[in-house]
Amino acid sequence: MTNSTTCRGILGLVAATFMTPVMAQEQEPTFLDEITVTSTKRQSTLQEIPVAVSVLQAADLKESQILDVKDLQFLVPSLRITQLQSSGNTNFIIRGFGNGANNAGIEPSVGVFIDGVYRSRSAAALNDLPNLERIEVLRGPQSTLFGKNASAGVISVVTAKPSLDETSGSASLTVGEYSQVLVKADVNGPLSDTVGFSLSGSFNQRDGYYDNLAGGDALGELDRFGVRGQLYFEPSDEVNVRIIADYSKLDEACCGVANLLNGPTGAAIVALGGNLVPNAPFAYQGYYDFTPVNEFESSGVSAEFDWDINDMMMLTSITSLRKLERFENGDVDFTSAPLLDPSTGNRTDVDIDTFTQEFRLSGATDTASWMVGAYFFDEDVTQETGLIYGTAFRAYADILTGGIPGTSPLWDIENGLTGLFLGGLPSLGSVVPGGTFFGEGQGNIEISTMDNKAFSLFGQIDIDLGDRTTLTLGANYTEDEKDVTFNQTATDVFSGLDLVEVGGLLIYGAVFQSEFASNGGDPVAANAVASATSAALAPIPCSATNPPPACNPSLALQPLQFQRPNINFPNSVENGNTKDDDTTWTVRLAFDMTDDVNVYVGAGTGFKASSWNLSRDSRPFASDLPALGSAGLLVPNIVAGTRYASPEESTVYEIGLKASWDVVSLNLALFDQEIEGFQSNIFTGTGFSLANAGKQSTTGAEIDIRWLPMEAFEATLAATILDPKYDSFPGGVGVSGPEDLSGTQPPGIHELSLTATGRYSFNIGNAAGYARVEYIYEDEVQVIENVPASVASREVSTINASFGLAWDNGFEAMLWGRNINNDEYLLSAFPSVAQAGSYSGYPNQPRTYGLTLRKYFD
């Protein structure tokens, strides 16, 4: 489907929508409900606010079986949420912009706020959602009101406040496929005339749907627990205080990975006695020699204070303290061969402590409403990572280098270096016994810390220019400072070898031995000839026109140096510090054409501070290598890379229309959005490449329609059309390695995404019933830039449905099914770990269904 065809289709829908009020007047159905919006830090309605925002209300979330933030993408086409190799590595993307997974030093571009409190990492927002009023998704840069981490958009989760009027509650039980059991309960009510409370809890357990044929737990399971308590104080009409405390825990085996293309390394896995399921993306089966571990604990407390100083002014304070602990250990080769140590093979242990404080002063006059505020953010991150070889990695490396244990080039190097040392020639300074390289227990361990402090000053004013025209002006000044430390312990002997030097030594030694025999055992004569001859042979670089063994043959083994040693910092050259500041702004003009239709035009900017690479792939910039050498800090076989990515700055220009009649509403946004310095983090098969794209832009349109053609039926359509492009990305990563991606289309961004729903309500006896169907479509797109589109493309065509009954006594029953047509698509893809020529990917969840029973009481 072309963009022009899609645009014509949507314009036809818009035209039909404008005709609808005339027909609706004849049928006289019920009116559309008014939808509240508070994510802009003041209360308004969806149709009045001149901002591109999607609002999901509690009833929609319940009927759609939305259990955590990841499920929101099925109802908001502009939102994409992708889970990667663990439960907490999740990317949030709006309009094609966003990142933040796979590295604790990379903050998200989409800010997630729960009851006004920022969740700095996606793992802290993935618990089962508590009692909800609504979820609001602000599309486009929102840094004017939200600061440094809203350059692509904001997800605002609003939960119900405790009641001061009456006690109420509910309890529910869900049973579903894969032995799922979900229990939820809550109670809400007054403790006195001025104090209310609420308490809610949930337990969610489900077996995995991705079988481990090597034994052990199936992957893709759920095992979650959460509890949340609130106190609400209203000592007077002018003052109220809301205190929230929450705790959640997750312990799951996640996530199933499929072999998309079995390259030549697959034979090596089989030769070692290992297994894999080749070329089968949707078999939902694999081989793992140990079960992945995903453990999370998230807890926090917040206090919101509101004071109506007078009829024209209000003070708000929101204080929060949060803690996130995350431990992961996964079998990243995704085979049953014991290439990694099962206890510490590929582990990540992260602790994050976050404190935030926001003050807002807002007010209104006859001709304007205004708000000023300040925000402070203080976060400490401690991370320990490790990648440790298992019992079979040496044999695997021997096979990959074309030999068998005892005869491969790795053994030749070990024996050659040992001979050089024993012969008194220049060497690495120690004997290298056979079997040293890739020994069990070798690897790297990294410990990183990051102290991040930031503050913002912001303000916004809405000025009435007349009865129907409003001008909005806003600005935000943000400062962000990060202090980072990195310390690595490297025991991977082979990765620490400089193969340029090693190759020269081996050639020198071979020439010396030959000349020693030719000169009758005279070492002086042999040394003179060997020195002159070996200089002409090595170590010259290898290239396409000068491949091994014509040049230094040892260089052909560099792809096996998965874990090259690093340089710890801070040091005398790298201070481990970034300081960023930026002023973002918003300007918008809104005009009420009629009482039912308003239009707006606006522009705004967003900002995201520098992101640090807190992983084994954090390496000094090439520009710092000379100074590091002069300071004597270089280590053998060091390579350049990136320590951090510089800030990204976004700009959007937008035109919108919002219309609401009795039975139909229409919201339309046309936008042109770009990000300078987009922070890209791509997995290359042995590590991650963190880099700034010069510029990424997207032109697009978004449309939301709600329609009640009759009292018993409601239909919705939400669609997003995007035309994305890397305007400049010379430092990108393609299928063959480093590549200039300028002028290409970013992968994973669908040109067309839409969600259509239909809901029919009816009565059966004394029960009110409904039937709801959802259809989600996303057109075909390459999944990721460094995996060929022929191997990993994605097209979505999914159907969800639910059927429910509610009785007057507060009892409800709901049958639900997700992906009932068993649609198959990839969530993401990547070059297989240490398996050149092979590709892997994450398949979507297959069809699930279940029954929910719920009882309300008061």
Task: Describe the function of each predicted region.
Residues P29-L164, I655:
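Acidic, small-polar-rich N-terminal luminal/periplasmic segments of exported/outer-membrane proteins
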Residues E304-D308, M314-S320, L324-V332, D592-K608, ...:
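Membrane-embedded beta-barrel scaffold of Gram-negative outer-membrane proteins
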Residues S122, T174-L182, Q205-S236, N240, ...:
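Outer-membrane beta-barrel proteins
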